[in-house]
Design a protein with these regions (language model features):
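Signature aromatic-anchored transmembrane alpha helix within multi-pass, membrane-resident enzymes
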Residues: 166, 185-189, 193, 282, ...
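Perimembrane helix-loop-helix junctions
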Residues: 127-139, 159-192, 196-197
Length: 473
């Protein structure tokens, strides 16, 4: 999607050792959604945390591996968090549930920052939980660093999700609260200093992010968060949507994904820790219920994605409680010998059902031109005969969105790149030809047709109707 293209673009810029690029010649021909392009700067408008991680992928020529690696680390983080809070069995089941979530797997296949923040937030919770056991200063330093870096990745989500956990951890350490705050602040100093320095370089103010540079009418006040809409109206529209969509898209179980959480209402040891995780989940969902936008991205409500680690552990706790009740029932009817087999069958079902039902359905829907982005024209570039020195003019009925599929193919300085991909602007074609003289000039016309919603949780998909490569010179 356009957001992912913007993040990947900034990662490429960081990998080149730059904070931003010089504006290209004929800048209107390089405009892409969610990319800041003004008289002095060409860069992403998003926070710099995730592009820093993507830069490592660009260094090794594989930026597409960054999110899968981060998802793997997030899964291990759920195991670690579950082990610290409860026991190893809960950690294993929680990690398994996250690993088989179609929502998590499909989000992990793109350049969106939510997987990074899921990973960072989950590990931050793990070290905060460890710090409550009084094990030295290291957990506080690490959780401070991770929490602050989470702000550099997704500021609003980090504050909403981590604030309840931070408050609870400080209450648990209230006898040495000053020391705890000091270590947390020391750990978080470097990421926050980087964010403030980056913002200052980009906008002239440490708290003014690229969003505001791109659109000066924005701010990070509550009113701006709601974009002028009634907060109560937004909440009562969005909060039920979050609950409905989370119930249907995290795993796609036939009984619903949130219903098993009712087992957590049964009194049992560890319920305070359950409440700690639930507070983080609810704070994130409630907070973004006041946001102007509500969208489904990669098969689920993306503004709640960072809660999946905590939600997986809560589901694991609920399933284990249900398992204990089922085992007790088997004992009462003298079928206790089937306890182990029943537990194994239940785990296999929990693991395989999402992978065999919801995942193929959602993956097929996403295999179309999602948000009007498609790699198909570039796949046909070689067969069309496009040479190494070429100016490629991109046209089509959705070029405003589709051009993002070509943006990353440009060099960091299009003037010196062998191939240049620009939007075909007829009124500026002569200017483009003069600015980027290449041996060949090509035009690619991409025609897309919007599809009806294939299901309740995938939208903005298109079919490729035609791709025409034509050599102009």
């Amino acid at each position: 999607v356009a957001d992912g293209v913007s993040y990947a673009f900034q990662g490429k810029i960081f990998a080149a050792g730059r904070l931003w690029l010089e504006p290209p010649l004929v800048p209107d021909a390089f405009k892409s959604q969610n990319v800041l392009l003004n008289g002095t700067r060409w860069c992403s408008l998003y926070p710099p945390g995730f592009p820093l991680l993507l830069a490592a992928g660009w260094f090794v020529g594989a930026p597409f591996l960054v999110n899968p690696v981060l998802l793997g680390l997030a899964i291990f983080g759920v195991f670690r968090l579950g082990t610290v809070l409860y026991d190893q069995a809960t950690g294993v089941l929680g990690a398994l549930l996250l690993a088989v979530s179609p929502f998590a797997l499909l989000m992990g296949a793109d350049f969106m920052p939510h997987v990074a923040s899921l990973c960072i937030f989950t590990w931050c919770l793990a070290f905060l939980a460890e710090s409550c056991k009084g094990i030295g200063a290291r957990p506080l330093l690490v959780s401070g660093f991770l929490g602050a870096f989470g702000v550099v990745v997704r500021p609003q989500a980090a504050v909403l999700f981590l604030l309840p956990a931070l408050i609870a951890a400080l209450v648990a350490r209230r006898k040495e609260i000053v020391r705890s705050i000091g270590f947390l602040g020391l750990g978080g100093a470097a990421p926050l200093a980087f964010l403030f320095a980056y913002n200052f370089a980009l906008s002239g103010h440490p708290l003014r992010m690229g969003y505001v540079v791109n659109d000066p009418s924005l701010s990070f006040s509550f009113t701006s968060f709601a974009f002028g809409f009634s907060p109560s109206r937004l909440f009562w529209a969005h909060f039920p949507w979050f609950l409905h969509d989370l119930d249907a898209t995290v795993w796609g179980f036939p009984w619903g994904d949130l219903l098993p959480l009712v087992f957590l209402l049964i009194p049992a040891p560890g319920r305070r820790r359950d409440a700690w995780l639930a507070a983080c989940v609810l704070a994130l969902v409630i907070g973004f219920s006041f946001f102007r936008f509500y969208d489904i991205s990669h098969s689920g409500p993306r503004y709640a994605f960072e809660a999946l680690g905590a939600l997986a552990l809560l589901a694991a706790r609920a399933f284990r409680m249900a398992g204990r009740l089922a085992a007790s029932l088997l004992e009462r009817v003298r079928l206790g010998r089937y306890r182990t087999a029943g537990a194994a069958a239940a785990v296999v079902f929990l693991a395989l059902f999402p992978l065999g039902t919801l995942l193929p359905e959602q993956a097929e829907a996403l295999s179309h031109a999602y948000h009007a982005h498609t790699p198909e024209p570039l796949r046909r570039l070689k067969a069309a005969g496009v040479g190494p020195s070429a100016l490629v003019l991109v046209a089509g009925n959705t070029v405003e969105w589709t051009y993002g599929s070509f943006l990353l193919e440009n060099g960091t300085d299009p003037r010196r790149a062998p191939r240049v991909f620009a939007r075909d602007l007829p009124e500026k074609r002569a200017e483009l030809l003069a600015a980027y003289p290449r041996k060949e000039v090509w035009r690619v016309d991409v025609t897309l047709r919007p599809l009806p919603h294939p299901n309740l949780w995938i939208d903005n998909t298109w079919d490729v109707e035609g791709i025409v490569w034509s050599r102009l010179r």
